[in-house]
UniProtKB/Swiss-Prot annotation:
The gene is HHT4. Induction: Induced by the crown rust fungus Puccinia coronata. Involved in the biosynthesis of avenanthramide phytoalexins, which are phenolic alkaloids found mainly in oats. Catalyzes the N-acylation of 5-hydroxyanthranilate with 4-coumaroyl-CoA or caffeoyl-CoA as acyl donors, forming avenanthramide A and avenanthramide C, respectively. Does not accept feruloyl-CoA as a substrate. Keywords: Acyltransferase, Plant defense, Transferase. Belongs to the plant acyltransferase family. Disulfide bonds: none annotated. It catalyses: 5-hydroxyanthranilate + (E)-4-coumaroyl-CoA = avenanthramide A + CoA; 5-hydroxyanthranilate + (E)-caffeoyl-CoA = avenanthramide C + CoA. It comes from Avena sativa. Signal peptide: none annotated. It is an enzyme of class 2 (transferase). It holds the Pfam family Transferase. GO terms for molecular function: acyltransferase activity, transferring groups other than amino-acyl groups. This is Hydroxycinnamoyl-CoA:5-hydroxyanthranilate N-hydroxycinnamoyltransferase HHT4. One of its GO terms (biological process) is defense response. It comes from the Eukaryota.
Length: 445
């Protein structure tokens, strides 16, 4: 699909403020160093969709969006800055007000429907501006945006947000606040911009082992050669799978019931199903250790809770670890392992994690990447509780929002339905051979 860029603008905050440097917590520094990609799709409202009079007027007017963006960057001023290093080499944010990239593009030969179920393939990634990382860390904007207009009248909004600046909750806080301003509303919750609340204790006193920061298990030497060979040589595939409300209900029906039966969250049950299917698709031996990475928002796990609107990264990681034979059996067995790891994520555990990171000589060594999630391991990040469908710029809510790409084999996302029908979707990257088997297994509930 041909995409033509019509205009690129660096949008600066609508009002200047004194330049400052923003200290990053340890949680801001152990995240991947690229821009997190996501894409929104919007259909042009019409009478048939039940839209009110004038709903399509000025549909995604670029000038209106730029003005609102400049206004949003005033309270969210770190977003308009650049990365920098302090005298010790620690990455921080230079709140320089240099602006964010806003691109207008057209895809005259494409329609929203051409993207099918919105699997995060390379076609979706083309809807987000590419970032040149070849220069110094101060050389690129922290936020890149692209509005692409399709022949059907629909629009996509591609977002690339540098992960040191914000996690999913904070990133959506910004995007949704921008959309509120564009719609003529006010920002509901102002950002809280002070990351020192997540400083480690002095002196740091970690009280747990923190397996989440230990190296991921490797394939056992006794495993089949197809699994122990160089993983970088295996082609990967990306796909998305929908589980309906009734299918999710059938998953729950597999759990024990009655007095004294364990209680599992929806995430634990679904994650157990995905972990089981991935392990079976990969053909893992029963004795093979496998680790599941579960991103966990610490905003309300910390006590006292962080202020509403805290802007930054507050993602801790629960990491259930088990032998494959444990997770390829009954769903309840895997769910018990997962729920146990999630239940351990208390204030005490999270504070200990901050202290543990403070004691590490090189935080960059703990940044997760391809080596973390590849076979035999898995990352499963849930966006179910995030307000991913709230970005109404004045022309209606998105019909889809999800990742604009999946960087690593073995990484997956859980997405809620835009129409609130109770279904959940799994976007995942696996080795192509394993994906064929996973496709059959995931639907077998």
């Amino acid at each position: 699909m041909a995409i033509t860029v019509r205009r690129s603008t660096m949008v600066r905050p609508a009002a200047e403020r004194p330049r400052e440097r923003l200290w990053n917590s340890n949680l801001d520094l152990v995240v991947p160093r690229f821009h997190t990609p996501s894409v929104y799709f919007y259909r042009r409202p019409d009478a048939g969709a039940g839209a009110g009079p004038g709903a399509a007027e000025g549909f995604f007017d670029a000038e209106r969006m730029r003005r609102a963006l400049a206004e949003a960057l005033v309270p969210f001023y770190p977003m308009a800055g650049r990365l920098a290093r302090d005298e010790d080499g620690r990455v921080e944010i230079d709140c320089s007000g240099e602006g964010v990239l806003f691109v207008e593009a057209r895809a005259p030969g494409a329609a929203v429907d051409d993207y099918g179920d919105f699997a995060p393939t390379m076609e979706l990634k083309r809807l987000i501006p590419a970032v040149d990382y070849s220069g110094d860390i101060s050389s690129f904007p922290l936020l890149v945006l692209q509005v692409t207009y399709f022949k059907c009248g629909g629009v996509s909004l591609g977002v690339g947000m540098q992960h040191h600046v914000a996690d999913g909750m904070s990133g959506l806080h910004f995007i949704n606040s921008w959309s509120d301003l564009c719609r003529g509303a006010q920002i509901a919750v102002m950002p809280f911009i002070d990351r020192t609340l997540l400083r480690a204790r002095d002196p740091p006193t970690p009280s747990y082992t923190h397996v989440e920061y230990q190296p991921a298990p490797a394939m056992l030497s006794s495993a089949p050669q197809a699994l122990t060979g160089k993983p970088t040589l295996a082609p990967t595939a990306v796909d998305i799978f929908k589980l309906t409300r009734s299918e999710l209900g059938r998953l729950r029906a597999q759990l024990p019931t009655g007095e004294g039966a364990p209680r599992f969250s929806t995430y634990a049950v679904l994650a157990a199903h995905v972990w089981r299917c991935v392990s079976l698709a990969r053909g893992l031996p029963a004795e093979q250790p496998t680790k599941l990475y579960c991103a966990t928002d610490g905003r309300h796990r910390l006590q006292p809770p962080l202020p509403e609107g805290y802007f930054g990264n507050v993602i801790f990681t629960a990491t259930p670890l088990a032998e494959a034979g444990k997770v390829t059996g009954a769903v309840a067995d895997g769910a018990a392992v997962i729920q146990g790891a999630l239940d351990r994520m208390s204030d005490d555990y999270c504070r200990s994690a901050l202290d543990y990171l403070e004691t590490q000589p090189d935080l960059s060594a703990l940044v997760r990447g391809a080596h973390t999630f590849r076979c035999p391991n898995l990352g499963l990040t849930s966006w179910v509780r995030l307000p991913i469908h709230d970005a109404d710029f004045g022309w209606g809510r998105p019909v889809f929002m999800g990742p604009g790409g999946i960087a690593y084999e073995g990484l997956a996302f859980v997405l809620p339905s835009a129409n609130k029908d109770g279904s959940l979707s799994i976007a995942i990257s696996l080795q192509a051979e394993h994906m064929e088997k996973f496709r059959k297994l995931i639907a077998d509930v």
